[in-house]
Amino acid sequence: MMMSLFNTFESPYFLGFPLMIFIAILISLTMFIPDNNLLIKNQSSMLASTFLKTMTKEIFSPIKKSGHSWALLLMTTLMFIFLNNITGLLPYTFTVTSQLSLNMAMAIPLWLGTIIMGATSQPSHSLAHLLPEGTPMTLAPFLIVIESISIIIRPLALGVRLTANITAGHLLIHLVSLALINLTKSLPLLFLTFSVFILLLILELAVSFIQAYVFVMLVSLYLEENLI
């Protein structure tokens, strides 16, 4: 018996170990997959390739060439978040991206990488973001503190946004599914609730991609801000 709705977001254990460890091992094993040129192309792989090319052009078109080396990393992050969001919608599965610890583990290194790139390649330009041009000297100390705080909380905003949206959607689906079970004796209400459930599921499919896209897009904006 489930004691709380949030029990579904607790990390499950397998043989006494957190399932997150096994997921990390499986992801690391993908590094040993042979080159795509050795694999047989099918419709699914061609569709995935077209999708990745389109998203790469969409995200990196406004970014200077010096930041194009981030394309592989950010596209991998997008697909990782998107596939985990989709997998979490399946019955009896664990939603990895509902864990703030995982989302922060992705957000902090990416954000820190953009900061380090800006600080090493153009330190004066990066520091100039802390004080807008034309600011009165009396307001300069306050604006520097405010801008510094806004930059520091960026990874927290990335992680919390993804966690909150995925968690809220799964809770709504869980509540509607409980209503379906309790309304089996009333066919009109059952049909209405089932229609709401299907619409909500379609919405969550869209949210799964939107949240992955927003996460990567925001990181690309941070990257663009620190490029020469």
From Swiss-Prot:
Q: Where in the cell is it found?
A: Mitochondrion inner membrane
* Keyword terms: ATP synthesis, CF(0), Hydrogen ion transport, Ion transport, Membrane, Mitochondrion, Mitochondrion inner membrane, Transmembrane, Transmembrane helix, Transport
Q: What is its main location?
A: mitochondrion
Keyword Ion transport found: yes
Where does the chain cross the membrane?
13-33, 70-90, 100-120, 140-160, 162-182, 190-210
Give GO cellular component annotations, separated by semicolons: mitochondrial inner membrane; proton-transporting ATP synthase complex
Provide the catalytic activity annotation.
H(+)(in) = H(+)(out)
Output the GO biological process annotations, alphabetical, semicolon-separated: proton motive force-driven ATP synthesis; proton transmembrane transport
What membrane topology is annotated for this entry? Multi-pass membrane protein
Q: Which CDD domains match?
A: ATP-synt_Fo_a_6
What Gene Ontology molecular-function terms does this entry list? proton channel activity; proton-transporting ATP synthase activity, rotational mechanism
Q: How does it assemble?
A: Component of the ATP synthase complex composed at least of ATP5F1A/subunit alpha, ATP5F1B/subunit beta, ATP5MC1/subunit c (homooctomer), MT-ATP6/subunit a, MT-ATP8/subunit 8, ATP5ME/subunit e, ATP5MF/subunit f, ATP5MG/subunit g, ATP5MK/subunit k, ATP5MJ/subunit j, ATP5F1C/subunit gamma, ATP5F1D/subunit delta, ATP5F1E/subunit epsilon, ATP5PF/subunit F6, ATP5PB/subunit b, ATP5PD/subunit d, ATP5PO/subunit OSCP.
What family does this belong to? Belongs to the ATPase A chain family.
What does this protein do, in the record's words? Subunit a, of the mitochondrial membrane ATP synthase complex (F(1)F(0) ATP synthase or Complex V) that produces ATP from ADP in the presence of a proton gradient across the membrane which is generated by electron transport complexes of the respiratory chain. ATP synthase complex consist of a soluble F(1) head domain - the catalytic core - and a membrane F(1) domain - the membrane proton channel. These two domains are linked by a central stalk rotating inside the F(1) region and a stationary peripheral stalk.
- Name of the protein in question: ATP synthase F(0) complex subunit a
Q: What organism does the UniProt record list as the source?
A: Myxine glutinosa
